[in-house]
C-alpha cells in the first residue's frame, strides 16, 4: 500500500480497472435467500455495475468517508537462508469517493503506515537491522493525498507522473471488470493485483545505501471478502469487507540495505470501518500526535499523488557511508 505497482493494483485496479485480468468465475446472479428481501441481482459482466461496486468497496457513495485498516508483518527474504519476520506494520487510511459529472468517481484518500515491534506492537522510531547490526531511523509512510479515478473503462496506469484525473474517453476503451469469485454460500471475493518493473526514483548513484538498484521489481495482491447479501443490497452505500494483502518489494530504503540480494514481503489483513474504534488505541494515539490532518479524507481532488518512494526522494537525505 505504499507505492504504485501497475494498472492492476489497488493504485489502479479500482481506479483503472481489472479488465485485463480474466475473471476467475463470472457466476450467475446471486439469488436472495430470505423471502421478501429486496435484492439487486449482480451483473458481473456490466462495466457500469462494476464501477459502482468498486466505489462502494472504497467508501460510501453518498460522500461519507470510510476508515481503512491493515495490520500485518514485514518479512525479510534473502537467498540461502530462511525468511524472518522483521517488523509489524499498521496502516491508517481515510477514504472518500465523490461522483463526477460523467458518472465516474474521484477516489481520494490519505494514508499512514506505521512500523511496529512485532512482539509488543509499539510503533518504532528506530530499528536494529539484524542483517547489518546497524541501528537505523524508521521512516513512516505518510501520503496526502493518494487519489485515482474509478471509471467504467480501463484508464491509464497510476504510475509516477501519469495524468489520471482528466483524460478523454478512448475510442477503443476496454470495459472495467473486477475479478469476481463466487466463493461460498455467503461470500463473494474480489481479487486484484499486478506485477511491475519500473525505474527506481532513488538513483543508486545518489542513494547508494538506500537504493536496491536502478529498477524496482514489485508485486502486489489483494483479496476482498464481501457478504453477498450486502453486494445485492443496492441501498447500502458502502460494502464492508475484510481482506488479505501481499506485497513483494525491494528492501525499504531506510533499512540501508543497498543492493544486498533479497527483498521484503508484506503480509497483511485489512478491513473497512466507519469509526476510529476500528483501530488499536495506540495507532490512533500516534495518528493524533503526528498526523492529525489524516483523520479526515479529502473532500475534493488535489495533488499530485506522490508515492512513498517519491516522498522519500523528496524529503530525506542520503545516509552517510557506514564507518
Residue ranges, per PLM feature:
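C-terminal segment of N-terminal export signals and the immediately downstream linker at the start
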Residues: 27-57
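Predominantly extracellular/secreted and cell-surface proteins with exposed
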Residues: 82-231
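Domain-length functional cores that host ligand/cofactor binding and catalytic or interaction surfaces
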Residues: 192, 198-199, 203-218, 223, ...
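Edge beta-strand at a domain terminus
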Residues: 242-323
